[in-house]
């Protein structure tokens, strides 16, 4: 359900940013609150023609790639490098705020050569990870797939072991 919500949010945000507006001033980018250390951090290397990784599933990746292809196609690999770095940061569990701040800084710096990408797409992507990144961050943790059995799920009777024991017992043919 959360993935559908994220996908819907991305779709609505992209559709809204694609329609002409009469306002002349864009909202200030989210990156204005970043620490000087993050703003000066080394940018990740650009991997040419890598698989697009901005999004949580194939649908959101398709929407986000379409956004970049429409507004700043020459920056595709640069923006994707920010997403790859962000994914790695989440997997390393380096702290969600740190990962998101680094991602937003990367987007802001990588998109400077395109006004529409810098003023619209980068802040949109930044806001999306800040708004919906909790689940992805938690799922990226090393123990994300482990669960504990509830008392109702624990069963004293082990059917598989019982059947295996029956199959291992030699049958009497007399």
Swiss-Prot record:
PROSITE patterns: PA2_HIS (PS00118). Its main location: secreted. Residues 1-18 form the signal peptide. Glycans are attached at residues 49, 143. Keywords: Glycoprotein, Secreted, Signal. Residues 137-174 are annotated as: Disordered. GO terms for cellular component: extracellular region. The keyword Acetylation does not apply. GO terms for biological process: arachidonate secretion; phospholipid metabolic process. SUPFAM superfamilies: Phospholipase A2, PLA2. The keyword Nucleotide-binding does not apply. One of its GO terms (molecular function) is phospholipase A2 activity. It is found in: Secreted. Belongs to the phospholipase A2 family. This is Phospholipase A2-like protein Y52B11A.8.
């Amino acid at each position: 359900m959360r993935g559908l919500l994220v996908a819907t949010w991305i779709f609505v945000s992209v559709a809204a940013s694609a329609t002409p507006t009469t306002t002349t001033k864009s909202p200030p980018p989210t990156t204005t609150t970043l620490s000087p250390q993050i703003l000066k951090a080394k940018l990740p290397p650009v991997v040419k023609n890598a698989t697009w990784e901005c999004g949580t599933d194939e649908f959101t990746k398709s929407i986000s790639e379409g956004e970049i292809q429409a507004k700043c196609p020459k920056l595709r690999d640069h923006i994707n490098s920010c997403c790859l770095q962000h994914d790695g940061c989440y997997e390393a569990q380096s702290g969600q705020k740190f990962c998101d701040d680094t991602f937003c800084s990367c987007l802001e710096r990588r998109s400077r050569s395109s006004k529409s990408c810098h003023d619209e797409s980068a802040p949109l992507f930044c806001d999306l990870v800040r708004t919906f990144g909790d689940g992805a961050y938690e799922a990226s943790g090393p123990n994300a797939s482990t669960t504990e059995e509830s008392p109702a799920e624990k069963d004293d009777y082990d059917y598989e072991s019982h059947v295996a024991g029956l199959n291992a017992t030699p049958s009497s043919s007399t």
